[in-house]
Amino acid sequence: SQKTDVNLAEITLQPAAETDFAAWLPLWKSYQTFYRVDIPDTVTQLTWKRFFHSVEPMYCAVAKCEGRIVGFVHYLFHRSTWAESDYCYLEDLFVDPAVRGQHIGKQLIEYVQLQARKRHSASLYWHTHETNLRGQRLYNWVAEKSGMIEYRMRVK
């Protein structure tokens, strides 16, 4: 894939609009390919609707360059037994491979950090796969490892 240099001054970060679906979807599919998952279209459609439903604590923000979406971040707020205020969980972060290495991922994380501050969140956290070494370089630069190890158990 060919790299594209972008002028960071031309990058705008903003909440996704409902009309951004067609531009967001290819990046969402690429994100799934990266993680070797195939999320059903019904879940994708439901997720997109949740981003815009007033009672849902799920959000999507996009990075745009010259009107084109080049990255996204999904985040949500949830209660914690460890704090009075909500935690903010950054669930998904993806930047178009053609524009990686230009701090767009960092800007998207900082966008979520700002939203968490506005909501007086007690914590902002996220996970990544142990094989996502490029992502870990960014995360080690902007945050600290918590020392927590994640376990999963099937419920079906």
Tell where the protein language model's regions lie, with residue ranges:
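A short beta-loop-alpha structural element at the N-terminal edge
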Residues: T12-P26
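Conserved GNAT-fold acetyl-CoA-binding loop/helix
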Residues: L25-R50
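Conserved beta-strand in the GNAT
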Residues: V62, R68-F77
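A conserved beta-turn-beta hairpin within the catalytic core of GNAT-like acetyltransferases
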Residues: H78-L90, R100, S146-G147
